[in-house]
Amino acid sequence: MMKIGNLVRDAYGSLGVIIKYSERSNRHVWVQWCAGDSCTVHVRNLEVIDERR
């Protein structure tokens, strides 16, 4: 289960932090990328690197 605050990586190797859940779909999350932008991403395209408990 992906939670807010988890450090994630996408298929391209970009790192980001989950900042909130999408209002439209329960399988999408908002990610704040280290490059500075943010967008929604389907959870199947993300790998959790560090889980915040």
Task: State what each model feature region is.
Residues K3-D50:
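Basic/aromatic-rich interaction segments and small domains that mediate binding to polyanionic partners
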